[in-house]
Amino acid sequence: MELTHFNEEGRARMVEVTEKQETVRTAVAAGEITMRPETLELILDKKVAKGDVLAVAQVAGIMAAKKTGDLIPMCHPLNLTGVDISFTIKVPDTIEAKAKVTCVGKTGVEMEALTAVSVTLLTIYDMVKAVEKGMVIKNIRLLEKTGGKSGDYRREE
């Protein structure tokens, strides 16, 4: 398999996509943050001093997806057509975040989905770190992607 982010001299480059066909691209990524049960209870009861943790984290994840091209050096800036962040509470101590990102474009949105999930979880950490510093962000992964020349991908869990 060829690594496409290097030129003939072995130096970094942004992949040329001018001739690629525009298709609908989607990606879904997920990750988790674990914490003490008491910390999760504070979040769910909306008793964290900084505000509604999940609402703020959701907006942060959406913003992060839109800024991925500014954060990851070889990512193309994309005109996203949709970003959705959702949460699954896994009692007693875990929040799973999922990001679904969509665009019509010449390159995939996997990095946007992964960035969205990462920043969503980092925002949860930031908002409750005064209560607990031992939280663990883990298992950030691409679950699926559709569109493009390489075809569809679905992680076997």
Swiss-Prot record:
Organism: Carboxydothermus hydrogenoformans (strain ATCC BAA-161 / DSM 6008 / Z-2901)
NCBIfam families: moaC (TIGR00581), PRK09364.1 (NF006870)
Annotated pathway: Cofactor biosynthesis; molybdopterin biosynthesis
The protein's name: Cyclic pyranopterin monophosphate synthase
Single GO biological process annotation from the record: Mo-molybdopterin cofactor biosynthetic process
Catalytic residues identified in the record: D126
Pfam families: MoaC
Gene name tied to this protein: moaC
Claim: Transferase is one of the keywords in the record: no
Keywords, comma-separated and alphabetical: Lyase, Molybdenum cofactor biosynthesis
Residues noted as binding substrate in the record, renumbered to the chain: M74, C75, H76, M111, E112
Record note on quaternary structure: Homohexamer; trimer of dimers.
